[in-house]
């Protein structure tokens, strides 16, 4: 233990750490042929959990991926999704998932519902998924649909154990993205994983487009059906200030 460790513990008493004092880290993987290779590399690097991250989690490819990981790494924490039904939660849990992500098309920059015709309003999805999660005694994560602190309150009240937040944190200094000046105000760029830019680069596998191996930018953009958009959010300063506002809203709720 060093002085730096003591200062970190004092400044961040609620930091999520493992038994060696390191910040816990999870990593997302797809369901491609290189799944085992990627998970093996992550486990060697000390990952705490892997997330099988797809737009439609209640599918044979995801179920088989969970079974493969659980067979090879029985003690590794597995998060899987996304689903919006009780049946989806049951299927993923029975395959070996420890936690299930809930939400299809709920994100502020996600257009899956209008592009694919699939999805459910987020509060309804959490309420539906929680029926199975409570019976199976597994946590669910509300992924998307959080624009204000009140949305976190509603998600937890509906049955979510926790939530994933994108747009509320996207404008913080600590988040990735370029700072832009637009009409005299500071913004940060923000794009969905299903946007054309992200899918052309690396995330096409998540949406089952099968175009992740296409080489040229023009070929990629011509063969992909985007399920998200790119935009900008106001720069909000330090993430500590943003979280303080969230906590205030949660306490009031």
Where are the model-predicted features located?
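Active-site-adjacent beta->alpha loops and helix N-cap segments on the catalytic face
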Residues: 2-16, 34-38, 54-78, 83-94, ...
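Gly-rich Lys/Arg/Thr-decorated short loops/hinges at beta-loop-alpha junctions or inter-strand turns
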Residues: 16-26, 42-49, 73, 106-114
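Short beta-strand/loop segments at the ligand-binding rim of alpha/beta enzyme cores
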Residues: 18-28, 68-84, 99, 132-144
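Alpha/beta catalytic cores of nucleotide-metabolism and tRNA/nucleoside-modifying enzymes
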Residues: 28, 95-98, 117-142, 146-253
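Glycine-enriched alpha-helix->loop->beta-strand junction motifs that scaffold or abut catalytic
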Residues: 44-50, 72-76, 94-99, 105, ...
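Short acidic catalytic loops
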Residues: 49-54, 141
